[in-house]
Curated annotation (Swiss-Prot):
This is Globin. Residues 1-146 form the Globin domain. One of its GO terms (molecular function) is oxygen binding. Keywords: Acetylation, Heme, Iron, Metal-binding, Muscle protein, Oxygen transport, Transport. This molluscan globin lacks one of the heme-binding histidine residues found in most other globins.
Length: 146
């Protein structure tokens, strides 16, 4: 889990993203797909589709809203070790079942702080705190065999 201070920094930087969650969720997913062109293939709805087709797809909002909601749960529980352990266990098993591994979350971790900063200037320490949060997800994926 994150320390209380780390969780607070993550929550403060997440606030502006979540305030416009629909558009920001869509924009993040498109940015991920542009940065890592193999990423759409991990989503049944987007496998083999072009960025233009994904952007025009009514499924984009469905997928991005699920991701934003799940990330919001992690942000809300970041300092609660018990909740985080249970959530990470379930999340990692679920995603391993989808064929998603730690590398995909390393990709997200590499670009997410910059995405957050593109929406609103994050508080000091936000990049490191997001890195720690995604590090927990990456470690859970590795434990799940991915």
């Amino acid at each position: 889990a994150l320390s209380a201070a780390e969780a607070e920094v993550v929550a403060k930087s997440w606030g502006p993203v979540f305030a416009n969650k629909d558009a920001n969720g869509d924009n993040f997913l498109i940015a991920l797909f542009e940065a890592y062109p193999d990423s759409p293939n991990f989503f049944a709805d987007f496998k083999g589709k072009s960025i233009a087709d994904i952007r025009a797809s009514p499924k984009l909002r469905n997928v991005s809203s699920r991701i934003v909601s799940r990330l919001n749960e992690f942000v809300s529980s970041a300092a609660d070790a018990g909740k985080m352990a249970a959530m990470l266990d379930q999340f990692s098993k679920e995603h391993a079942g989808f064929g998603v591994g730690s590398q995909q979350f390393q990709n997200v971790s590499a670009m997410f702080p910059g995405f957050v900063a593109s929406i609103a200037a994050p508080p000091a320490g936000a990049d490191a705190a997001w890195g720690k949060l995604f590090g927990l997800i990456i470690d859970a994926m590795k434990k799940a065999g991915k």
